[in-house]
Structures are given as structure tokens and as C-alpha cells.
Amino acid sequence: KFAGAQLAKKGIVLSNDTAAKTVSETAPEAEDGSGNAGIKKLAETMPPNETPGWQYSSSGWWYATDATTYYVNGWADIDGNQYHFDSNGYMATGWKAIGGKGCYFDDQGVYQPDRNGSMMVALTFDDGPGVYTSTLLDTLEQYGAQATFFMLGSNVEKYGADVIPRMAAIGCELGNHSYAHPNMKELSTDDGLAQFQMTDDLIAQYNNGQGATVIRFPYGNSTDELLASIGRPSIMWDVDTLDWQTKNVQANISAVLDSVSPGDIILMHDIHETTVESCATIVPELINRGYELVTIHTLAAANGVDLAAGETYYGFHGGTTNE
């Protein structure tokens, strides 16, 4: 992972003086993680680190400040580079919202302050997967683009095994759009939750036991009680292509390219052949215009927004993100 590092017990030996240090516990400088990292004692069940420094577990990289403590919830300067550690002590990579600011960390966790996330949009696809989803994934993969798929459980049963592992492999985000697309305002809260739970269980079969990270209510309709109980962010949109209505390739292309702006969440449906065909033009043209096509979580983080369960988001435009 790091130049000159020596891998041992899934840990990494860094600077020679690290092992000699004894470090006192300190609280993080800021509760939201925007200040200097705190230093926390390892749980009593954890063995002491024979070699403090970078360590690895199945959840990610973390840094042992001495044999029994580690960095947590904030920034740390290590060997001249800036890193950020979350509330569990794991090192950040990619885009993270920290103190209301989007911060980018490379694959080795090093903060890259010059990375610009201002030209991003999120393509989102509802009601799939379907017979055309694999072709859409071909297009996304060809151009190094990601999207977020809000899937119906009834279609996951039919097509999930073929496409969900591939979605995850190319960096797409998995969303939940209910099992059968009912109007949630016509259901009880328990019945609405059951719609999403069924779909999560189906998605998890093809995603290492993990369900969706975001949800979208069918027709955009919900009740306050269901929204408060859903346990994840609710994602709406600010560009509706009406692809389900027009079913016309050129109309889809125009609907996106004539109105797109940074921070947009674009609504489409991968169950329609015309939609997937139009994406063969839309995706490379957006990239040609300088846009990055990213997932919902990445778009939010790059705009300094930490998505919250039970909140609804329409797009990310300099603070106008949710209602």
C-alpha cells in the first residue's frame, strides 16, 4: 500500500520512531470530524499491536498510534501527508463530506486538496433490472462511468443474478425502489416497509449480504411516518427525462443534454430499450462536456453533504439539496 512499507499480519510498519511512542488518549477536536483526530484506546478484547503504525482489517485501514491506541474521527498528519479517519478509526478514500466540505482522498488515503468535484452529475435508473440493463452496464463500463440503480424486487428476482454483481463491480450504487411499485400513500407503514425489506433481501443475495444504500419511493410518494422509518436517505431527482412516456431516443438525449447542470440527479428507466440506446450517446457526450458521472453518495459527498436517513434529496446545488 505505501512505498517502502513491509506487510506483516495484515499490518504495515512505517516510520521507525512510531513503535517507541506511548500516546495518551485525547478527544477528537471536533465532533463532526472536521478537526484533528482523537486518540482512542483499543477495546480490551483487541490484542496490543506488536508494530504500531498502519494496520489493516476487513473493514479497512487504520493507524495504531502506539501498541494500544489509534486515531479516530478527524485529521492526522502522518509522514508529511494528510489523512482522515472516521468515527470508527478507518481511513477515508474517495470523496467524503467533512465539516460541510467535499474532500477527496486517493486510493492510499492521502488528501488531495486540488481535486475538483464541481462537475458531477448522477444518472439514476428506476424499475429495473431488465433485459436491457446489461447493455447499459456495457456503456457505463466502456466510459468509466457510474450510476445508481433503484431496483424493483420483482425484477431483481428475474434479472438480479446476472447484473447486480456487475453493477457493484464497476462502482455503481444499488438502490431500492420497493418490490412491486405500489403507491406508498395507499399502504400502511408496515406494509410499505415490507416492500423495501423484501427487495433488500433479494438484492443482498447477489451483493455479499448487503441490501441497498439508498431508496426511492415509487412515484416519489411517501408518508412522513414511512420516510422516518425507512432508515436510509430518500432520493428524488431534478431532471426528469420522461423517457417512460416518450420512449424516443432523441427525446431522451435532448431531455438530458439541453437541461443538465452540475449537481443534477437525472431520472431514467433501464427497462426501456430506447433509454438504454440513448445512453450510448448521453454518457460520452456528458463526459465530453467535462462531467463526471457518479453515484448518489459520491455526488453528495463531493458537495459536502453527508446523506442522512429519513431525509429527502433532490439534487446538490450549493446547499439546495433537500426539502
PLM region descriptions:
Residues Q146, E173, P233, D240, ...:
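Residue-level detector of anion-binding/catalytic polar loops
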Residues N73-G74, T93-G94, G263, V305-E311:
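Glycine-centered loop/turn motifs
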Residues D162, P182-N207, N221-D264, T275-S278:
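Alpha-helical scaffold elements lining the catalytic groove of polysaccharide deacetylases
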Residues Q142-Y143, V156-E157, T274-E323:
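C-terminal domain-boundary segment and adjacent tail
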Residues K1-S118:
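Extracellular adhesion/carbohydrate-binding repeat motifs centered on closely spaced tryptophans
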Residues F125-G128, F150-S154, S178-Y179, I215-G220, ...:
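Active-site-proximal beta-strand/loop segments in catalytic clefts of secreted hydrolases
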Residues G109-K185, D191-M198, L202-A204, G211-A212, ...:
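Active-site beta->alpha N-cap acidic-glycine motif
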